């Protein structure tokens, strides 16, 4: 439960854009959640985003509605929430190592993959894909972990400085990440057929994964109250 911040930020289809995720992570709720990591032996002074929103490429068809995912062999990382999500949405998730994803796409072992625009460009996934569907389904957090014993050895003045610098650095990192995504998307527009999912059709993702949300609530990772507070902060 103490790692609820990371779990909530990658929660499938919970937020519609990375800026809303950032708003939650920088809020009092986000800071309170980070403090809970102390129970697991971590101190987190700040959390950012590891790239932009994750979107879907594939070689079969544009993803305009949830129904278009049905039967697609989707490469996923070995992350439980990702696997559960694509199963819930009707796809056939296949765990493939990140470094082996390009070859898996090229040899048709999988039909598609999900990653931020930057990864799709840097790893040249577009060479083995035909469609990019901008669905903004998930974002991965980038928590800055430090040893609590080390942190607690600092004077109060040094703790304050460390916390302030950590937060400022993470804000700078987020700005660089999110600004760069626009350029990466423009590159992909020249390589792939791009479609942007209509907001009303994206609601199908939200409906389709509510059972996944409930699973993690039942497991004690977070509560519906925390989810609703996060959505209120994000203004969804």
Q: For the regions a protein language model found, what residue spans apply to each?
A:
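Single conserved hydrophobic/aromatic residue that forms the stacking wall/gate
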Residues: 1-5, 9-10
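Extracytoplasmic
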Residues: 6, 51, 69, 139-141
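Small-molecule pocket liners
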Residues: 11-13, 18-22, 52-56, 140-144, ...
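Short, solvent-exposed loop/beta-turn-alpha elements that line the ligand-binding surface or hinge
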Residues: 16-41, 67, 199-202
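An extracytoplasmic/periplasmic, membrane-proximal ligand-sensing/linker region
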Residues: 31, 163-167, 171-236
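Bilobed "Venus flytrap"/periplasmic-binding protein-like clamshell domains
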Residues: 31, 35-111, 119-122, 175-178, ...
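Pocket-lining segment of extracytoplasmic ligand-binding domains
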Residues: 81-83, 92-176
């Amino acid at each position: 439960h103490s790692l609820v911040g990371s779990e909530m930020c990658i929660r499938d289809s919970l937020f519609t854009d990375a800026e809303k995720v950032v708003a939650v992570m920088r809020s009092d709720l986000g800071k309170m959640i980070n403090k809970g990591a102390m129970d697991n032996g971590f101190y987190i002074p700040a959390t950012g985003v590891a790239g932009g929103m994750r979107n879907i490429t594939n070689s079969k068809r544009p993803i305009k509605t949830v129904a278009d995912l049905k039967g697609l062999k989707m490469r996923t990382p070995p992350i439980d929430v990702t696997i559960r999500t694509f199963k819930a949405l009707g796809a056939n998730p296949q765990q493939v190592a990140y470094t082996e994803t390009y070859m898996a796409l090229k040899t048709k072992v999988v039909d598609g993959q999900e990653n931020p625009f930057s990864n799709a460009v840097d790893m040249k996934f577009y060479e083995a894909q035909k469609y990019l569907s901008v669905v903004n389904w998930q974002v991965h957090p980038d928590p800055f972990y430090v040893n609590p014993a080390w942190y607690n050895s600092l004077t109060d003045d040094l703790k304050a400085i460390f916390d302030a610098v950590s937060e400022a650095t993470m804000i700078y990192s987020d700005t660089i990440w999110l600004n760069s995504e626009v350029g990466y998307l423009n590159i992909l527009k020249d390589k792939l057929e791009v479609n942007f999912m209509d907001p009303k059709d994206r609601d199908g993702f939200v409906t389709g994964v509510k059972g996944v949300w409930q699973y993690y609530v039942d497991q004690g990772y977070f509560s519906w109250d925390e989810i609703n507070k996060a959505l209120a902060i994000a203004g969804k």
